[in-house]
Amino acid sequence: MDITIDDNRNVYVVSDIHNYADGFKRLLKKIQFNENDLLIIDGDIFDRGDTPVELYFEILRYHNIQVIQGNHDVWVARQIIEQFGHRKTGEYISYNTVAIMEKRLTPVDMLRLAEWIQEKPYYINLTINGRKYQIAHAQTFLTPERMLDKRKIYMGDWHYEIIKC
């Protein structure tokens, strides 16, 4: 995904919210987030905290929030698809998120949420007044073998797919 900003809009990047809806709302209030701003959530919306549904709906309220998939988001989507769609999509680590969500959302809504996650990019190319940035929720786990193969980028940990260059 490519985003270009050619004005004086505020651009914020935050990651690792991990289900903390109240903290996220306080952050938006603190930065006085408004319709002219852009917020990029750089992965890991889900897992660990206890308010995933509230956080999800809070994010959906804004047209000017962009989301990048993080490893926890990928795991949540995979678990939902396996549990409610009855098909295996890859490995995942199960935290508390799906158990909390299924108390409040229908199976159809759970699958829609998984689809929403999977539609999000792994990175965003951001240009602000001519300066270029690439934002990704990534950590490299480089072994000597991985370092030798310059055609591959390893994002996240071993649960992520390899992005071939």
Q: Predicted regions span which residues?
A:
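N-terminal donor/sugar-recognition subdomains of glycan-related enzymes
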Residues: 1
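Core catalytic region of metal-dependent phosphoesterases/phosphodiesterases
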Residues: 4, 10, 14, 19-93
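Beta-strand-turn-beta hairpins that frame and shape the catalytic cleft
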Residues: 5-12, 126-134
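Histidine-centered catalytic micro-motifs
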Residues: 17, 136-140
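Active-site neighborhood of divalent metal-dependent phosphoester bond hydrolases
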Residues: 52-55, 61-126, 130-133, 141, ...
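Conserved, charged catalytic cores of large soluble enzymes
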Residues: 144
